[in-house]
Amino acid sequence: MKKAWLSRAQQADAGGASGSEDPPDYGDQGNVTQVGSEPISPEIGPFELSAASEDDPQSGPVEENLDAAAREEEEPHEQEHNGGDDPLDVHTRQPRFVDVNPTQAPVIQLVHAVYDSMLQSDLRPLGSLFLEQNLNIEEFIWMCMTVRHRCQAIRKKPLPIVKQRRWKLLSSCRSWRMGYRTHNLKVNSFESGGDNVHPVLVTATLGCDEGTRHATTYSAGIVQIPRISDQNQKIETAFLMARRARSLSAERYTLFFDLVSSGNTLYAIWIGLGTKNRVSFIEFVGWLCKKDHTHIREWFRQCTGRPKAAKPWLRAHPVAIPYDDPLTNEEIDLAYARGQAMNIEAPRLPDDPIIVEDDDESEEIEAESDEEEDKSGMESLKNIPQTLPYNPTVYGRPAVFDRKSDAKSTKKCRAIVTDFSVIKAIEEEHRKKKAARTEQPRATPESQAPTVVLQRPPTQQEPGPVGPLSVQARLEPWQPLPGPQVTAVLLHEESMQGVQVHGSMLDLLEKDDEVMEQRVMATLLPPVPQQPRAGRRGPCVFTGDLGIESDEPASTEPVHDQLLPAPGPDPLEIQPLTSPTTSQLSSSAPSCAQTPWPVVQPSQTPDDPTKQSRPPETAAPRQWPMPLRPIPMRPLRMQPIPFNHPVGPTPHQTPQVEITPYKPTWAQIGHIPYQPTPTGPATMLLRQWAPATMQTPPRAPTPMSPPEVPPVPRQRPRGAPTPTPPPQVPPVPRQRPRGAPTPTPPPQVLPTPMQLALRAPAGQQGPTKQILRQLLTGGVKKGRPSLKLQAALERQAAAGWQPSPGSGTSDKIVQAPIFYPPVLQPIQVMGQGGSPTAMAASAVTQAPTEYTRERRGVGPMPPTDIPPSKRAKIEAYTEPEMPHGGASHSPVVILENVGQGQQQTLECGGTAKQERDMLGLGDIAVSSPSSSETSNDE
């Protein structure tokens, strides 16, 4: 082609005519100017062709033997550039410039312009660049446009435009549709493995098609690249570092990267792993917990919503998910230490191979053989992120609660071992210990463990108040225990097959083997649900002093119900609960819901009266046929009045009382407070009286007649008091009225307090124990009488109970929460003439019952309608004429207990001081008739 252009130029210089030759037929190439008819002057340039040369018919033809490759390149563009403006019109408008539009001008014009540039010496390097063999059409056009733009920029300076950065490549031609501009942007780059930010200046050269016209040119507007925020840049950097760490890590850790990326917590991954992956997961967690992992910690927080990685194996494993072959603490510690010693870049042990993947080599290997293609396919499957079958919800902690890193303490609990040689030495030592443990034979456990009985001497207790007291008085010193305390400790529960029953039950009972009896009864009785027990003192019952024997040995069952510690300097001494014996079951057979009997415990030994000790805390015995009501948590602590108290006031025996109301069990079941004693020949249990806050049950069951079996008199030790149930004939009274030096016993037999209560006015009955309690506490309540209690007292009077002979001489104070009703002496009433006369049994007559006004004539008052408590009020009733004498006026103290639904009456003569002396209250303040406040009924 170069030779053809040179020959054409020589012909033009020679001026030879070529009219005989046919002009070249360009066919569908459009209007193409005939370039080369005249020589190109250096002043015009390669792209500035004259219009006269285009119209000259004498111009030489273009060589037809063009390069075949050039023609192949021209053919696809022929159809595109046929339409549009005629290039000749453009040349006429701009005679000194040929506009070569890439979207309209055919490519052959550019080819001619390039070859024309070869004729100029200064443009030959540009022509040689265009004639490069490796250029395609797009690159060829781009180079032409660059040369054109540069030539125009040299001739004409760019127009000044507002917000113009440096210079723009503009065109003054309206047909030019492309604009260029540069834009500078400062961005921050990150440093791998740290938080340091480096500013980088980025210069972008932008171009747009069909840009907004500015002045006489088309150009693009200013494009502002949005700058990423610091938080987003931190997050993107963290994810980039996590992906890099996953690519560099060992293959066994990539699973954990994928699971954490999908939002799973470490605990969810831990409980779902198999046995073979647990050690690797512990190493991965150890690598996550490295302190210098800034980006990895941020990646973990963004994925899971947790502030930092924790040890999931410290939490309890769920029961529903099996946990086979658990790891020991030594294995977990060693695996965690290996993870802590790993490199910060990726979780990799020193022995793990480094896999380098080359994309080009892998493509060549895939093309060589099909087998290697299958292997590469498996490798590509391994690279797919692994996820759990479910998609867990990520709950993130609000940013308000995120603490700064500088506010956290940097204390290290232990040193982190970073040397793998030390870790390997520790692993070897652990492996030797594990092998030694497996070689040792296991010790065979014994078939049955014995029951060990621990005996300890009684503890010493200094005398003094134990808890908060409501009545300030001096305490009686504690009495010593009868002997060493025996506590049964059951090491292992014996199996049911170990208990062998020899013979029948009758033979077992005839042999009187108490130990075997306890075992058999324990196997036959159903298990008892444990009832919550409060820390109150159980009732103390007398055995040694009163001559009462108990056939209940110490039970061997473990103590399940433990009492709460009472207020005091020493802890409670807990004794095991006792199971019911055969005698108790036989005695409680007629009634399936009886009041539980207290356990008998001695309170003093006559051999060593000076030994001071504290009585043990006893729990109420279990009652199998009857459900127990839970006792309130607040304990009931008091020292009751001794049974046979002397008449004179004794300051050392003033009781300490702190009464907390609670609901008794018999009030829930519906039984009267008095129950007959069991008739066993070797068992005599004291009955348990009702507390002060008894509520009348809505219905009374069928009353039971007590068995008419007189109790067997026992020989009591010397100096022990006599237990006296409510008698009918009290002993000879020893009471001294005011002003009388010597007490004068009445000649006739006086009635008992129970008979007085039976003959009292209706609605004013009640045991004297309630009167004594009201005197101690001071609060008196009002309510309806209890028909059930009246029937019980009538049965008691009909049964004819007799007290035990004799009376105690020594005084005792027993730690118990329940009062035993004392025997009240007959009260001497001052007559009208001033002489003391004994009040006979028939002196007390009926008086009208006084109810509350709003409940008068309505019926029995339910416990829920009980009005608030009232104070004691004293009223005087005129008694009618009695059989043994005239009418006498005596003040009647009406004690009304609303909480119990009873109105109790204590007829007394003389002053309140005599009453306290008679009851043994000492100096306890009781409201006198003159100072008592009369309470309103409403």
Swiss-Prot record:
Residues 698-750 have a biased composition (Pro residues). Residues 78-92, 430-440 have a biased composition (Basic and acidic residues). Residues 1-92, 360-389, 430-470, 528-628, 694-752, 849-870, 910-938 are annotated as: Disordered. InterPro entries: EBNA-3/4/6. Keywords: Host nucleus, Host-virus interaction, Transcription, Transcription regulation. The keyword Cytoplasm does not apply. GO terms for biological process: viral process. It is found in: Host nucleus. GO terms for cellular component: host cell nucleus. Its main location: host cell. Residues 601-615 have a biased composition (Polar residues). Residues 575-594, 927-938 have a biased composition (Low complexity). May be involved in transcriptional regulation of both viral and cellular genes by interacting with the host DNA-binding protein RBPJ. This is Epstein-Barr nuclear antigen 4. The lineage of its organism: Viruses, Duplodnaviria, Heunggongvirae, Peploviricota, Herviviricetes. The gene is EBNA4.
